[in-house]
Amino acid sequence: YWYISSQNKFKPGSSIGVAVGDTPYGPFKDALGRALVTNDMTTYAKHSWDDLDPSVFVDKDGQAWLYWGNGVCYRVKLKDDMVSLDGEIEAIDRKDASSFSGGFTEAPWIYKRQGHYYLVYASGFPESIHYSTAKSAGGKWTAQGVVMPTEKGSNTNHPGIVDFKGHSYFFYHNDALPGGHSYCRSVCVEEFVYGSDGTIPELYMTREGVKQGVGTLSPYRCTEAETIAWSEGVTSAVSAKRGVYITGIHDGDYIKVRDVDFGETGPKRFVAAASSRYHGGEMELRIDGRDGEVIGTLRIPYTGEWENWGEFATDVKSVTGVHD
């Protein structure tokens, strides 16, 4: 299920819609052929764009909740089909200081962890991130404080928090990438540790993000080229024969893959699928940095057309252990 906010051409103002697919990758199709929530259903706020930023949470008992809003925090139960409202829409007063420290602006993110219900949201403008806690998804929220203060950036900041493989991560956005601005944002992530009482510490934007991964990549199985920890210069596209691929490669462009475990014996060859419509080129394989040791150079010849793919190989120096 994919819940989105969109302008509604049949009813004035923003609306909430829902699409369905068989996998998180899609393809998705409109579940209802109409909006799930329209602006005439949410009259607490007087502006037309209050139906933004939907967030869905399914509790342990199977009850699903939809939270959303701009200038007011709305919530409603969903029926078992996940595409029908179950009961009346409730508006939580954005100015209630006991529920929202700093006031609620938009972008609610609701989840449950170790018996605590959390509502993380954007406050003010330029936006900071705050959070509240409750004893149930439909209960009274109690303001807890700031997660991320306002910093120079895109004016807005929207949160998401997940636990993954024993680690806790805070996702947010800013305009830090080249060409970024208020409506051209980049997604960021920071790892953090909850307090013993379940409190969230105050976090700050960094350029480094997560310093240690939760696992390693094997170089002895096929790794898609779009598996990227960092890149410069390249772009992605889709091929009818190969699916997603990396293109627009020029001198100095690179892809970084983190935490590759070469094991104790090390590789002997590197193989890649590639094509070249023009003069071909060479791809250097380096470890631990763009200026790191070259362990191999793969020559990509002219293949005639972009869809004339081939597999090309080169010998590599032996390298062991975990490297980027």
Residue positions per predicted region:
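Carbohydrate-active catalytic/glycan-binding domains of CAZyme proteins
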Residues: Y1-H323
